[in-house]
Curated annotation (Swiss-Prot), chains A, B:
Localization of this protein: Cytoplasm
Lineage: superkingdom: Eukaryota
Keywords: Aminotransferase, Cytoplasm, Pyridoxal phosphate, Transferase
GO molecular function: 2-aminoadipate transaminase activity; aromatic-amino-acid transaminase activity; pyridoxal phosphate binding
Phylogenetic classification of the source organism: Eukaryota, Fungi, Dikarya, Ascomycota, Taphrinomycotina
CDD domains, sorted: AAT_like
Family to which the UniProt record says this protein belongs: Belongs to the class-I pyridoxal-phosphate-dependent aminotransferase family.
InterPro entries registered for this protein in UniProt: Aminotransferase_I/II_large, Class-I_PLP-dep_aminotransf, PyrdxlP-dep_Trfase, PyrdxlP-dep_Trfase_major
EC number(s) from the headed UniProt entry: 2.6.1.57
Function: Has aromatic amino acid transaminase activity.
GO cellular component terms, semicolon-separated: cytosol; nucleus
The protein's name: Aromatic amino acid aminotransferase C56E4.03
Biological process annotations from GO: aromatic amino acid family catabolic process; lysine biosynthetic process via aminoadipic acid; tyrosine biosynthetic process
Keyword Transferase: yes
Length: 474, 474
């Protein structure tokens, strides 16, 4: 039998610890002991007769319509969201368009919770999820729940700029953990925490780690199972809460084999789930992981529905925060998404995720092949990623032909970037992702295979190669 | 010619002043001086081919279908959101489902800005709007933009509990301004600010006022034009930023005439707009008003789309906050809403708002008539509201038959509430809305005419009258 999670309430921020429930939310559940329908004149909920959307429909791909050899190939199905329904497994507009609980509509929440159980099955009792208005909001809520102004937070040495922009205005110092090509180093994390000197850092020892373990942004690296276990053990040793930010989790891939093509692996849903790298959540016996899931990379960014999974303490405090920060995710989104998920079912959704996995594998292979073909090998180096949507590559600074100009790394990167844009290719500069600019001594660029058309990859990389050849001894 | 707004940057919080734009957002706009299409390998935007929603449709009421005497009476129209479109006035799914600007999709934003101009026409140059994930998020963003932990904020003596729950965990002291039946008192505001003693209050003089000017929650009161002008002048005198929270603005009504019916006034859109009480925004020559608008009461709470209107400084800082707090409103919501608004046009939307106005007037009249009929006049007193969805009424404490028990106001209200629920009617207790419990010496209840069916009003109020008669000398 699974154990109870640890009491980790000492991690709550002043803001979070002081949150209270609105009396109006609680009172909506009032019941009479008599057999009588309660007429509510309590909460200011508009009568659904004033909702001007009376039905919604969406065209979605039929299950396996994405497979060329399927009898459903190319087929679209229509799913409907009716105004009202007496079926308990329908989320009607009269509910979806109304004020809802901060945790999201029950039916969609149940679907996402069951999905989370299938994939991660957290090893303690009482875990739950809260739906949010997306991963961005998850992070804002989690940071405000756990940190006070003046705290420090552990992050990967290169990290997602918007996450850093969420942290710094809250008064947090971002402490970079060293990385190699396979993600961040447990030894570096242990070293920082073991030798923390609150006086010289000007803040108490960090108690929160923010990480993108799979297909990390920007480096594309994925932490191995062994590292994950070491890191979790370190989190226990140093009493750290792990914010596991996993938008790219389902974009896991087979190893790159040097070809601009990919096999559409005919594996079962069970095999697909089994091959996914174990998450921190799946090994979280203490309840010290807050996992943030997103639909942005696997359904659509515009859905603005994400969720976080955690132990009851963080769920309850997170719910109080969500109620006053965002109220709830869009009911229009939730209505359409639930209709789609219900139509597909858990298995149909896993089929879709396999399709996404295959599509990104193909895209990665195309982009890597273009890089292998066009980039000058004498100055560019990179590791083929096995997850995510990014390839991170170093450009050898020692071969820069204008070294006499004494430019900084950001200056060189900006100059190369401007020339690349002028030649018709946009990409991201390494310095945008550097947590501590004082220790930035290598030139990096990040390219993504998520967006451009496949036939554009060669053109884009050839253009960039030309820019490099003008600036580096190749 | 309208003037420039004042420089009010000294009002920004530490958090807000330190926000920076993500470099990735800026670089998406990179352009080449050559006549060349830029292939972007920069931002991690999924290719729209992976968005599983290929088209959305919604059934919405045809313009004036809500009028019994219209040729469109009862008619529904279908509006569609296609996957892609070359029309510049269509918001397609390929855009709506993608990552967007924090300010919202341009077309919907333009519609709401034009609507704001028609209604309020702010009297300075450069005002703008940002779409948010709803009014709740507007308030969270505004509070974090303007206040630091330890600050005080002016609020109405009775106020919206969720707003107070947004403020207090941020470390704000809520300073109640005295009210009468017509809203809060300018003299009380001036008195507090003129005599502010930072030492005894333990915080600097407030520089932010939070108010619900129209159909205030919970009191239903509406500030007169004269009071609004006085308050704006006081805001200038004491250098106050006004957070104008206006979810009930369009629920303005003619005076109650003692009848459970209402005339569906055949007035033009121009007359409708002209009769709306002037907002603080409409008199904001300095740019010191942040107006928060909501679709929750006039379209649907589940839309989770709101917007705030302010001068450029607050728009730019608010955008930086929205990007890291919520990213943007749901694109699925925005797609459906824009299709509806485009179909209706500005004039059609005003027709809809007149319908909402009429419907709420009818509901208010029904509920007031039920109250006039059933509530014991010797203990209950109330003022018919001219806006909003709430009626606030006092129950004379001096007639409480258990006065010897020495119960507090909240204890009496809770007891009455529990008995009411047991009898099958739910309503809200006055003490839930009290900002300073130390000065709570009157019994109040709040009822809403927004939700229940018209034929339930009599039953509900009769039940509550019975509870009062058991507890008060009537």
């Amino acid at each position: 039998m699974a154990a109870q999670p640890k009491d980790l309430s000492h991690h709550l921020s002043v803001e979070s610890a002081s949150r209270k429930q609105s009396p109006l939310k609680a009172v909506a559940l009032s019941k009479s002991s008599r057999n009588i329908k309660i007429i509510s004149l309590a909460g200011g909920l508009p009568n659904p007769e004033y909702f001007p959307i009376r039905e919604m429909d969406a065209e979605i791909p039929a299950i396996n319509s994405w497979k060329k050899d399927s009898s459903n190939s190319g087929k679209l199905d229509t799913v409907s969201v009716p105004m009202s329904s007496s079926d308990s497994d329908v989320l009607p507009l009269s509910v979806a368009l109304q004020y809802g609980q901060g945790s999201g509509a029950a039916l969609l929440s149940q679907f996402l919770k069951e999905h989370t159980r299938i994939i991660h099955n957290p090893p303690y009792e009482g875990w739950n999820i809260i739906m949010t208005t997306g991963n961005t909001s998850c992070l804002d809520i989690a940071l405000r729940m756990l940190t006070n102004r003046g705290d420090s937070i552990l992050v990967e040495k290169y990290s997602f700029p918007s996450a850093l922009q969420s942290m710094r205005p809250l008064g947090l110092s971002c402490i970079p953990i060293d990385m190699d090509q396979f993600g961040f180093l447990p030894e570096s994390m242990d070293d920082i925490l073991t030798n923390w000197d609150a006086t010289s850092y000007g803040s108490p020892k960090p108690h929160v780690l923010y990480t993108i373990p799979t297909g990390q942004n920007p480096t594309g690296s994925t932490l191995s199972v062994e590292r994950r276990k070491q890191i979790y053990t370190l989190a226990q040793k140093h009493d750290i809460i792990i914010l596991e930010d996993e938008p790219y989790y389902y974009l896991q891939m087979d190893a790159y084999e040097g070809k601009p093509e990919a096999a559409d692996k005919a594996f079962t849903n069970e095999q697909f789930v089994k091959e996914l790298i174990p998450s921190f959540l799946s090994m979280d016996v203490d309840g010290r992981v807050i996992r943030m899931d997103s639909l942005s990379k696997v359904v659509a960014p515009g859905s603005r529905v994400g969720w976080f999974t955690a132990q009851p303490l963080f769920i309850e405090r997170g719910l109080r925060a969500a109620e006053t920060a965002t109220q709830s995710a869009s009911g229009i989104s939730q209505g359409i998404l639930y209709a789609m998920f219900k139509h597909w079912g858990q298995d149909g959704y896993l089929e879709w995720l396999k399709h996404i996995r295959y599509s990104y594998t193909l895209r990665r292979n195309y982009l890597l092949y273009a890089m292998d073909t066009y980039l000058p090998k004498s100055v560019c180096s990179y590791i083929p990623p096995v997850a995510g949507m990014f390839i991170w590559f170093e450009v050898d600074k020692s071969r820069y032909i204008h070294a006499d100009k004494n430019e900084s790394i950001p200056e060189i990167e900006s100059k190369i970037h401007a020339e690349a844009v002028e030649e018709g290719v946009n990409l991201a500069c390494g310095n945008w992702f550097v947590v501590d600019p004082r220790v930035n001594d290598k030139i990096f660029f990040r390219v993504t295979f998520a967006h451009a058309e496949l036939e554009e990859f060669n053109v884009a990389i050839e253009r960039f190669a030309g820019v490099l050849k003008n600036n580096f001894k190749c």
